[in-house]
């Protein structure tokens, strides 16, 4: 299972994101990402370059709440040349914007709302969304399982796996804050998970120390979940 370190707090890219990339570089993290909100385009360009220089895949998650802002962010992701694009709800339009690029697109399943984002929707709806995404040609799905308002988190992860068979990628984003949750989402069928705030604020592993120690703890728990 893959760990995607998000340079974010409360669903926005943090001001010192470039400094955090240097910490991640020391640990040879393979996946590093940011949100489409919280930083200007010029900074996102610098972040994309820095992540690539660190030897990691570049991830971007779209959390903008309006259709127009979402589609602008998808176009920006194409311009930046990220490797993975998560989020957004207008999958057909997103795929058209990304057509011809190598970007792997994982839209939200369920009904995300607000910012920071929460997730409405039952497992049957999430599974149906995933089947539709697979038929469209999406690379996978982004599920805010632990932000759910209408279902048990692991039921949503399992619904994604039923609806999107391998090699489709199921990524659990948001509120992964313990080894137990990493192991649980893996058992439910997830291929990857994201952590931002819990690492940056140093409450993933209380008492372990600042960011580098937090990331080491997450990596160890990720390996243990395999």
Regions found by a protein language model. Name each.
Residues 41-44, 70, 91-96, 153, ...:
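Short, well-ordered alpha-helical microsegments
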Residues 45, 120-128, 151-158, 208-214:
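Charged helix-capping and loop-helix junction motifs
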Residues 24, 51, 98, 161-164:
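A generic structural signal for well-ordered alpha-helical segments
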Residues 67-79, 83, 121-128, 155, ...:
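Catalytic cores of alpha/beta
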Residues 80-93, 136-150, 175-181, 186-211:
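Glycine-rich phosphate-binding active-site loops on the catalytic face of alpha/beta enzymes
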Residues 3-8, 30-34, 58-62, 84-87, ...:
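Hydrophobic faces of well-ordered beta-strands that scaffold small-molecule active sites
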Residues 1-59, 65-68, 74-81, 131-136, ...:
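Conserved N-terminal beta1-alpha1 strand-loop-helix module at the mouth
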Residues 55, 63, 67-149, 163, ...:
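Conserved anion-binding
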């Amino acid at each position: 299972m893959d760990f995607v370190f998000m340079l974010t707090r409360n669903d926005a890219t943090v001001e010192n994101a470039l400094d955090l990339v240097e910490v991640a570089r020391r640990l040879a993290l393979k996946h590093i990402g940011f949100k489409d909100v919280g930083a200007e385009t010029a900074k996102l360009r610098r972040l994309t370059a820095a992540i690539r220089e660190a030897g990691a895949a570049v991830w971007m998650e779209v959390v903008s709440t309006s259709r127009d802002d979402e589609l602008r962010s998808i176009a920006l992701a194409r311009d930046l040349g990220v490797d993975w694009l998560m989020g957004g709800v207008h999958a057909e339009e997103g795929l058209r914007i990304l057509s011809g690029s190598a970007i792997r697109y994982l839209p939200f399943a369920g009904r995300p709302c607000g910012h920071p984002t929460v997730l409405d929707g039952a497992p049957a709806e999430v599974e149906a969304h995933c089947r539709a995404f697979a038929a469209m040609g999406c690379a996978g799905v982004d599920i805010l399982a632990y932000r759910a308002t209408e279902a048990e988190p692991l039921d949503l992860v399992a619904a994604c796996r039923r609806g999107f068979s391998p090699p489709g990628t199921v990524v659990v984003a948001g509120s992964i804050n313990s080894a137990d949750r990493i192991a649980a989402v893996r058992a439910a069928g997830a291929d990857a998970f994201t952590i931002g705030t819990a690492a940056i604020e140093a409450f993933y592993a209380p008492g372990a120390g600042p960011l580098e120690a937090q990331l080491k703890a997450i990596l160890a728990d990720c390996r243990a979940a395999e």
